[in-house]
From Swiss-Prot:
Keyword vocabulary terms for this entry: Cytoplasm, Hydrolase, Metal-binding, Nucleotide-binding
Name this protein carries in UniProt: 5'-nucleotidase SurE
Enzyme Commission number(s) from the entry: 3.1.3.5
Known role: Nucleotidase that shows phosphatase activity on nucleoside 5'-monophosphates.
Compartment(s) where it occurs, according to its Swiss-Prot or TrEMBL record: Cytoplasm
Top-level taxon of origin: Bacteria
Stated family: Belongs to the SurE nucleotidase family.
Cellular component aspect of the GO annotation: cytoplasm
NCBIfam families from the UniProt entry: PRK00346.1-3, PRK00346.1-4, PRK00346.2-2, surE
Gene that this polypeptide is encoded by: surE
Binding site for a divalent metal cation: D8, D9, S39, N91
């Protein structure tokens, strides 16, 4: 089995080192990961400058791009054959609830799924530097075996969040839905020595709703959350509502200004 491993914390991050080691018991591992921290880049793809790749040792490649770039390069260029599975992680910090929309870790798995390859995103739900990557990686390797044996539903990948606990203290895995985070004004304003304002985004601790059956609910109780995510983002329940709207007045008229600002 050929396994492509990537992340958004960078090729030298402890999570990806532990993950690659665990997955070598499952198949042949190739690591293609960003050459530096790329957290919260979402599904960004580099289009306006060339990408550089460095093979830092046999089967381990560092890319000066995003996790999505890494998956593309791995599948289409760096691997001799397409991988049987892509595993992204182990991320430092959880990817829970609405936060998955920002996650480079999750987006790497999404990109693989777009290409028809089974994929798993794995995160260690820690507020610090994390110390139990091996436990998370061991679970990811076992889950990868299951996915390789059973397959996944079409256009579906798995988002896994593992509490930052020793293996013997972890609760069993549970299948969950995506949770919900409440967003506030998480902007920290500072003043530089020249009197100009600068800003940090995300300065406050995230607040998740503790809803039974969700990823956050499981992780908070020491259990491993496994959430199936789907490529189709359509809100089918809203289709009939929107179809009842009269949108005829929204058609642009000839001669209207372009709306250019400059």
């Amino acid at each position: 089995m050929n396994i492509l491993v990537t992340n958004d914390d960078g090729v030298h991050a402890p999570g990806i080192v532990a993950l690659a080691e665990a997955l070598r018991l499952v198949g042949t591992v190739t690591v293609v990961a960003p050459d530096r921290e790329r957290s919260a880049v979402g599904h960004a793809l580099t289009l306006h400058h060339p990408l550089r790749v460095t093979e830092i040792m046999a089967g381990i490649f560092a890319v000066d791009g995003t996790p999505t770039d890494c998956v593309n390069l791995g599948i289409h260029t760096l691997l001799a054959e397409a991988p049987d599975i892509v595993v992204s992680g182990v991320n430092r910090g959880g990817n829970l609830g609405d936060d998955i929309t920002y996650s480079g870790t999750v987006s790497a798995a999404l990109e693989a799924t777009l290409m028809g390859i089974p994929a798993i995103a794995v995160s260690l739900a820690t507020n610090g530097h994390g110390s139990n990557y091996r436990a998370a990686a061991a679970f990811a390797a076992q889950l990868a075996r299951e996915v390789l044996d059973r397959g996944l539903p079409r256009d579906t990948f798995l988002n896994v969040n593992v509490p930052d606990l020793p293996a013997e203290e972890l609760g069993g895995p549970v299948i969950t839905s995506q949770g919900k985070r409440d967003y506030g004004g998480d902007i920290v304003t500072k003043v530089d020595p020249r009197g100009r304002n600068y800003y940090w985004i995300g300065g406050n601790e995230p607040v998740f709703r503790d809803i039974e059956g969700t990823d956050f609910h499981a992780v908070k109780r020491g259990r491993i959350s496994v959430t199936p995510l789907h490529l189709d983002l359509t809100n089918y329940a809203s289709l009939s509502i929107l179809q009842s709207w009269d949108l005829s007045a929204c058609r642009p008229e000839a001669g209207q200004p372009s709306g250019a600002l400059l």
